[in-house]
Curated annotation (Swiss-Prot):
Protein name: WASH complex subunit homolog 5
Taxonomy, superkingdom: Eukaryota
BP GO terms, sorted: actin filament polymerization; endosome fission; endosome organization; nuclear envelope budding; positive regulation of cell adhesion; protein transport; regulation of actin nucleation
Keyword Ion transport among UniProt keywords: no
Keyword check for Phosphoprotein: no
Any single Pfam family the record assigns to this protein: Strumpellin
Subunit field text: Component of the WASH complex.
Cellular compartments annotated: Early endosome
Family: Belongs to the strumpellin family.
Function summary: Acts at least in part as component of the WASH complex which may regulate wash nucleation-promoting factor (NPF) activity and is required for its membrane targeting during endosomal sorting. During embryogenesis, not involved in the wash-dependent developmental migration of hemocytes anteriorly from the tail.
Gene Ontology CC terms: early endosome; endosome; nucleoplasm; WASH complex
Keywords associated with the record: Endosome, Protein transport, Transport
Main location as per UniProt: other
Length: 1191
């Protein structure tokens, strides 16, 4: 029974453990990009905001005090709730950390089971005697070491501690989501911070300099690393010793058979060498003191190389890694001595020139075909082996290692400088070898695959043709076939007939017998030709040569083994370049494409070479038939596909640099043809030279397009990449970068001398509109040459950028924030760039800056809004126009498109919701809890609702009566007024945005606007009659329709309800008192026919004041609004009666109140009948006459 048979529990359990190890590594690599920024605390803003809340393991010492501090601080409580919202993501991190500990525990348990005889007839020694068992046992220990290194490299120790503490605090730490008991204590002990610093952070620290440079450099040194880290989990010593011994002495993967040349020994054992390197950290005494063993290891595995790939391109330099290990350091120093390096580099340099030339000759067009591959298969594989060995050595030893242990050590750098100097290294030479090697491998694989598929057919065809020629010769020597000058020869007739008969019996399924017979026949043909002097007749000689060719082809087909492709796969391993290719070869690739767009064909071969390495992490997962296969293969394939996109991004980048020139010419130089033009003026629009320049630039773009489209559809892992889609994605990505940059730079509002904020705002918007129009015209012009739908792409991407930035800006008002990876507008393939906020600016991005700038320009404290003209004016005389609503919002739409208008509206809506929530909660709390408020309002309610109100005392001086109540909140009114005006201002802006969207949609998208409006009315009618639309499908449809209605401006901002409130009549009464307390600060203007502040210095503005009140009351039941109007009407009637009885004339208080009420019901869209029911008609209709003094 095989070790990996399904019935062999011992083998299957070990295979599953190793499979899980590979899956854990993929999960760590996947999660490293999703660490929430607040747990990194790598900038001052996050440290200041979350530093007190998010702690590392120091939390355990002050847990109770920490929790008490959070409970006592509302700010910390709110931040804690915000951080708690990320628990699902934190849980995934914890499960990944826990799986690391589970992996080690499962492996330890498996070893114990082997030692205790749990598996029948299986012990540690017998498993190591099995080929598969030996490989898997070594891999199991090696993978745990790789996991530890990977997690420490990609997720820093302090970040791990903060994530573990967050999980402990927010989940309780007692159980995992699956219901298993949590072992968080063991996980914390294993993954606590080691002190290791990532190379990128270490480089920044070392680059700072200054007085404390020495101290900072010392902080980067981690003693006994990674020895102490690996010792946190103890495995059975015998198991570790046996694994290290097998790795040291055996060829566990039988690689030496594939690399027979002694110079290739270190490459043959490279995978085993990496495993041995990791496993030695589990028995550090060998590294420290076993000098003879270390010399043996170095002589066998590292005699000509000192940089190794540990796992999927995670490279390590042994000079750096073994610096703190005496025996290991001593052993490796022999390899890196200057004479040894010089000799080795000289040899490799010579080989590089020879192999590059050979591969160049092979990949030259017209050389490689199926017959060439069939004939020279062994020579080609030998060349592949040589070129890959050379490629591996140069890639690893001319690049900086990925994992750096000693950041302050100088020896590593000295060795690399020496190598580069001796090699006189040129990266482009190595790049050419890589290209040749990749193209050769791809072509040979394709030909071999084709040959293997048609092998039976080729064999049969060759045999039939050989038999046919032999039969023809037999007939010719019989005299029945009249070939010129051939004498009849019965013996040759019989012999050729017998040979043809023997060939008939050949079978491809019996290669040894058939091969021997073919060789015998070929030898016999040579002997016959020589003996009978048949070469004197050219026709016979030609027949015999063609027969030999057919037989030779049959022999080649027999010799072509089925496992040849597996051998090629193994000798062309490129997994060591997973990281190096991105760091070192991206610039040469992009420069190559820039010079020759058709170079993408060769670069495709490079990526297919790299894609073949996905077998390394997937092999064991696939063998175990694990469910993780899809997710792991998808991760690596996505990473590789994204890398290919990054390399090919040079094509869109170059296109856009050319397109920028076209944009300039089309926008600023070339005149747009009018619909009609006079014949005499036609020359003015010709502009031959400028149009020739545009044509030349357009041709350059077309060449790049053609180049990338020459690349075939490519399967990268499990992801298929279509060149047309790659081109479109690249164009989208570059367009997104340009548009995002244009929005970001175009909407920075720095004060300029001689310009008001409004002038600067309009100027910026007009400039931005011109830029966007330039892109529109250019894409409209160029889309046919790019073979994409340019205008659709421009519309979709600009809309996505705006929606993404609106979402980010709105996050400030959300407790459960939308994370970067959760955003439906963000994309891994076409990412929207993030720009840092401006210093001292409360906004997060350009949409927030624009929203705040518009608010600044329309501040009710500085401006007056005239509703009839939709225009803002200065409060100070001479009341100049500040911002004309119709003209300004048209400019805004041209600059940001409808998507930007809708985005602004959404942002203002979020601001309103946040302000209403905070202030209404506080207001309602006071209305229900504050003794003075409750008692005063209760007393006033009883008096106002009494049957005998107004009493004689009130009737004499009603204003004094009301004033007595309003003065009780004198300290509250200023704050409340600012809030109401702020709400009114934002609602006014939302209303103006809706108006502009409605107007533009009626002009530019009349059919859409009409259709959406009709559907909306139909659905409203349907909802009023039944609840059929309240199911899931109905809600989805209503949501989609709401989105369309926003874009067509078919919505009423003042009717929107932002939050759920408790209804109370006290709210109506309080808002009534607030209103009458401020009416005296306004007066009616006959010029503008509206209320204006009496003083230019007064902060109040009538329309925002009313709109703010309407919005607040809209959050309650409509009865609250009606009650508010009733109180206001009662106030008007009461004061009117008193004034008419006293002076027979209405005072300004009543007139102002009536103008206010009429404006209120108009803005609130209420019928006039609401007032007619509450105020006598004589007052309502004749108040202007009744307030006029008669002479």
């Amino acid at each position: 029974m095989s070790f990996l048979d399904d019935n062999n529990a011992c083998g299957q359990n070990l295979l599953n453990i190793v499979s899980v190890g590979n899956s854990i590594i993929a999960e760590i690599l996947r999660l490293k990009d999703y660490v929430p920024s607040i747990y990194r605390l790598d900038n001052k803003a996050d440290k200041a905001k979350y530093g007190e809340l998010i702690l590392d393991f120091s939390y355990f010492k002050i847990a109770e005090d920490h929790e008490r501090r959070i409970e006592q601080s509302p700010e910390l409580t709110e931040l804690d709730d915000e951080a708690r919202a990320q628990l699902p993501l934190i849980t995934r991190f914890y499960l990944a950390f826990q799986s690391i500990h589970h992996y080690a525990s499962d492996l330890q348990q498996y070893i114990e089971e082997l030692n205790t005889g749990y598996y029948i007839q299986q012990t540690l020694e017998t498993v190591l005697q099995e080929e598969e068992g030996r490989q898997l046992l070594c891999e199991s220990l090696y993978l745990f070491g790789v996991i530890l290194l990977m997690v420490d490299f990609h997720i820093p120790g302090d970040v791990r501690e903060r994530l573990l503490i967050a999980y402990y605090r927010y989940s309780g730490g007692d159980a995992t989501p699956s219901g298993d008991e949590s072992n968080i204590h063991d996980v914390c002990l294993l993954l606590r911070s080691t002190g290791y610093v990532h190379p990128s952070i270490a480089a920044k620290v070392l680059g700072l300099g200054g007085k404390q440079a020495g101290a900072r450099a010392a902080s980067l040194v981690v003693p006994r690393y990674p020895e102490a880290y690996f010792s946190r989990f103890r495995f059975d010593e015998n198991f570790v010793d046996l694994v290290v011994a097998r790795l040291r002495c055996d060829d566990i993967y039988n690689q030496l058979n594939l690399y027979p040349h002694p110079a290739h020994r270190s490459t043959a054992l490279s995978t085993q060498a990496a495993m041995l390197y990791v496993c030695l950290y589990f028995c550090p005494q060998v590294l420290h003191s076993q000098g003879s063993q270390m010399r043996e290891i170095v002589d066998k595995f590292f005699c000509d190389n000192w940089t190794i790939s540990v796992y999927m391109g995670m490279t390590v330099n042994l000079v750096d890694a073994w610096l703190d290990f005496k025996a290991a350091r001593s052993a490796i120093e022999n390899v890196i001595s200057p004479p040894a390096i010089k000799a080795l580099c000289q040899q490799q340099k010579e080989q590089l020139g020879k192999i590059t030339q050979k591969t160049q000759e092979i990949v030259r067009e017209g050389v490689l075909n199926d017959n060439f591959v069939l004939e020279h298969a062994n020579k080609i594989i030998h060349l592949m082996r040589q070129s890959n060995v050379l490629l591996r050595w140069f890639c690893l030893h001319t690049s900086r290692e990925v994992f750096i242990f000693a950041h302050t050590a100088t020896l590593t750098g000295q060795v690399q400088k020496c190598v580069l100097h001796e090699l006189q290294f040129n990266r482009n030479t190595l790049y050419n070898l890589l290209l040749n090697c990749s193209q050769m491998e791809l072509s040979v694989r394709e030909f071999l695959a084709e040959i293997q598929q048609t092998k039976e057919e080729r064999w049969t065809k060759s045999r039939e043709e050989a038999m046919q020629r032999l039969n023809e010769l037999s007939e010719a020597f019989a005299g029945s076939r009249p070939l010129s000058k051939i004498e009849q020869n019965p013996q040759l007739q019989q012999w050729f007939g017998e040979v043809a008969g023997r060939l008939q019996k050949l079978e491809l399924s019996r290669p040894q017998k058939s091969g021997r017979l073919i060789i015998q026949v070929m030898q016999a043909l040579d002997d016959v030709q020589e003996y009978h002097n048949l070469h004197s007749n050219m026709l016979v000689k030609q027949q015999l040569q063609e027969t030999r060719d057919m037989l030779n082809q049959m022999a080649q087909l027999i010799n072509l083994k089925e496992d040849i492709e597996i051998h090629i796969q193994m000798i062309t391993d490129f997994s060591y370049a997973w990281h190096l290719l991105q760091f070192d070869f991206t610039p040469p690739m992009q420069e190559h494409i820039k010079r020759q767009p058709q170079a993408v064909i060769g670069i495709r071969a490079v990526f297919l070479k790299l894609a073949s390495t996905l077998e390394v992490p997937l092999m064991r997962i696939n063998q175990a038939r694990s469910e993780d296969l899809v997710s792991v293969s998808n991760y690596y394939s996505t990473e590789l596909a994204n890398f290919l996109r990054r390399v090919l991004q040079i094509v869109p980048e170059t296109m856009f640099s050319i397109l920028a020139k076209i944009i300039y010419l089309l926008t600023n130089v070339i005149k747009e043809f009018p619909t009609k033009v006079e014949k005499e003026r036609l020359k003015d629009y010709a502009q031959f030279e400028e149009r020739a320049k545009v044509a030349q630039l357009t041709n350059s773009i077309a060449v790049f397009t053609k180049g990338i489209l020459m690349m075939k559809t490519t399967l990268v892992g499990v992801i298929e990449l279509d060149p047309k889609q790659l081109l479109e994605d690249g164009i989208r990505k570059e367009l997104v970068n340009h548009l995002a940059n244009a929005y970001n730079l175009g909407l920075i509002f720095t004060p300029e001398k001689g310009k008001t904020p409004v002038q600067l705002l309009q100027q910026k918007l007009q400039a931005l509109a011109k830029t966007i129009e330039g892109y529109r015209r250019s894409f409209e012009y160029i889309e046919d040459y790019l073979r994409v739908q340019g205008l659709r792409i421009l519309l979709e991407e600009s809309q996505r950028i705006i929606n993404y930035n609106v979402e980010k800006e709105c996050n400030a008002f959300l407790r459960n924030k939308v994370q970067e990876f959760q955003s439906e507008h963000q994309s891994q393939i076409i990412p929207i760039p993030n720009f840092p906020p401006l210093l001292g600016d409360p906004s997060n991005n350009f949409i927030g800056r624009l929203a705040h700038e518009i608010l600044r320009c329309t501040d009710p404290k500085q401006t007056i809004f005239l509703d009839l003209k939709s225009t803002w004016y200065e409060k100070k005389a001479p009341h100049q126009e500040v911002l004309a609503g119709s003209g300004f919002f048209e400019i805004l739409r041209e600059a940001l498109a409808p998507a930007g208008m809708v985005g602004l509206e959404r942002l203002y809506a979020h601001m309103l919701a946040d302000e209403l929530k905070r202030n209404l909660e506080r207001l309602q709390r006071n209305l229900t809890s504050d003794r003075m408020w409750v008692d005063t309002l209760a007393a006033l309610t009883r008096e106002l609702e009494a049957r005998d109100f107004p009493t004689p005392e009130v009737s004499k001086q009603p204003l004094k009566y009301y004033q007595a109540y309003t003065q009780r909140w004198l300290k509250v009114w200023p704050t409340l007024l600012d809030w109401v005006l702020c709400i009114g201002q934002k609602q006014l802006l939302r209303r103006e945005i809706a108006g502009e969207l409605s107007f533009s949609s009626k002009c530019d998208a009349k059919l859409l606007e009409n259709t959406a409006d009709t559907l909306n009315k139909a659905l409203l009618l349907e909802l009023s009659l039944s609840k059929d639309l309240c199911d899931e499908k109905g809600v989805v449809m209503l949501t989609e329709l709401q989105e369309t209605l926003l874009y067509t401006g078919n919505f009423e901002p003042l009717e929107q309800v932002f939050l759920i409130t408790k209804n109370t009549h006290n709210m109506a009464l309080f808002m009534f008192l607030f209103t009458i307390a401020h009416l005296g600060r306004m007066q009616h203007s006959t010029i503008t026919d509206c209320l204006l502040p009496k003083s230019a210095k007064d902060n109040i503005d009538n329309v925002p004041f009313i709109v703010g009140l309407v919005t607040i009351l809209q959050q309650f039941h409509k009865n609250v609004k009606m009650l508010y109007i009733s109180y206001m009407s009662q106030y008007v009637v009461t004061v009117s009666e008193a004034q008419l009885l006293d002076k027979e004339i209405l005072g300004p208080e009543v007139v102002t109140a009536l103008h206010f009420l009429l404006a209120f019901i108009r803005i609130a869209r209420l019928p006039l009948g609401v007032l007619e029911q509450r105020i006598p008609n004589i007052i309502l209709s004749e108040y202007e006459y009744l307030s006029t003094l008669l002479k």
